[in-house]
Amino acid sequence: MALDIHAHRILILDFGSQYTQLIARRVREIGVYCELHPFDMDDEAIREFAPKGVILAGGPESVHEANSPRCPQAVFDLGVPVFGICYGMQTMAEQLGGKVEGSELREFGYARVDVVGKSRLLDGIEDHVDADGLFGLDVWMSHGDKVTKMPEDFHILASTPSCPIAGMFNDDLRYYGVQFHPEVTHTKQGGRILSRFILDICGCEALWTPSKIAEDAIAQIRAQVGTDNVLLGLSGGVDSSVVAALLHKAIGDQLTCVFVDNGLLRLHEGEQVMAMFAENMGVKVIRANAEEQFLNNLAGEADPEKKRKIIGRTFIDVFDAESCKLENIKYLAQGTIYPDVIESAGAKSGKAHVIKSHHNVGGLPEEMNLKLVEPLRELFKDEVRRLGLELGLPYDMVYRHPFPGPGLGVRILGEVKKEYADLLRRADHIFIEELRKADWYHKVSQAFVVFQPVKSVGVVGDGRRYAWVVALRAVETIDFMTARWAHLPYELLETVSGRIINEIEGISRVTYDVSSKPPATIEWE
């Protein structure tokens, strides 16, 4: 009987914290499967999920306010360990008979908590030991309310001068609560605390590993697809590349990929995709050269959102035309990943805002009547990358910087023209090449060049040049929600600028974008 890598699972209830997905990623890193669900998850669904433990995440609400979120009673009836984090601790305290009040002194940022109670959760975990033998932890706080009275039979776990009950526990029930955030890297021992709860207290086995995920996904694909044929839109990005490798391993020649070359790709990208998948891996790939169709449809349009929609519609037209030439296709594969699923579920329930629609083949006409295969829908991006390496994809492909679905179409400000795309492709290639040479490519999270439709005077030799301006953009980020502009060495910027201006006749000036997010976004359009 095949190993069920989902058997040992953790349920995470989301109360609206910006850190909730981070908790899930930390649990997965420990090697245990988990799922995120809204705080008002149905009691029957909780029982059917049958978790080995439950984590109550943080949230922006105040427990003592009317209609604030509450944990379902079913969680406390399961008889499994429960770990409340920040708001999760507060609602646990309130619901089990304790009391929560607003605090005059709010705690945001770094703090040191004293570990004052001996519990299974924090036993032997510390950052400091003072002269009196008191253990201390360096943690990240983000709260305005605090627990002022614990439920019956609970004990104080940790405290700070302004928050005497910064943690509480009941070892008999295996209920724990902390006011700080163990999931963020600023809490130095956060990983150990979560591991202690999940592996030791909940008794989970670390079954969620790249090799086991690959085996499970291949088995699931074969069971779902059988002998039918599958179609995949291959973009060359990480998600679709991993899906292609996974499907090819699972069903071989039953997979056909369509690679749409829209004329807005990076330098040599089309050739690289074909070489990797068609030549090296033996995947059936149809290359649709549609540059002229995309550029004709984009002609005269300068509005960023309208450009995105034109590119999306044209992609669907080209993909649909190619797929109609194929026979016996029953399934459409997509690179949907877990954050997409979470965002979609939140949008349907009204509990989250849709950031933007995803540019993929999800908008294909319904008359295609294909069933979906989404082998990555349980995985976060970092898990997709690790799975790609497990499947034998090159490191440089798996850890390539993000590239927007509309490609260079949103890195050319204003109207898109072939001349602009060709210049931008070459400039971007030089920037990335020099970042790699200087060992900076993997130190930054994303780097690219933006084409600006303005001209600037330059001097080349004895001649005057009036040519286009480009901007270099490089950022450092963990989650792409916030980002800091990368402080690249001046010598590196000088080299990149010199090469672009000297090697590309149509560019006379190079600027460097020093805007962080917020207030700026990472992409210019």
Swiss-Prot record:
Pathway: Purine metabolism; GMP biosynthesis; GMP from XMP (L-Gln route): step 1/1. GO terms for cellular component: cytosol. ATP binds at S235, G236, G237, V238, D239, S240, S241. Keywords: ATP-binding, Glutamine amidotransferase, GMP biosynthesis, Ligase, Nucleotide-binding, Purine biosynthesis. PANTHER family: GMP SYNTHASE [GLUTAMINE-HYDROLYZING], GMP SYNTHASE-RELATED. The keyword Magnesium does not apply. It holds the Pfam family NAD_synthase. The active site is at C86, H181, E183. PROSITE patterns: GATASE_TYPE_1 (PS51273), GMPS_ATP_PPASE (PS51553). It catalyses: XMP + L-glutamine + ATP + H2O = GMP + L-glutamate + AMP + diphosphate + 2 H(+). Catalyzes the synthesis of GMP from XMP. Homodimer. It is an enzyme of class 6 (ligase). Residues 208-400 form the GMPS ATP-PPase domain. This is GMP synthase [glutamine-hydrolyzing]. The keyword Transmembrane helix does not apply. The gene is guaA. One of its GO terms (molecular function) is ATP binding. Residues 9-207 form the Glutamine amidotransferase type-1 domain. Its EC number is 6.3.5.2.
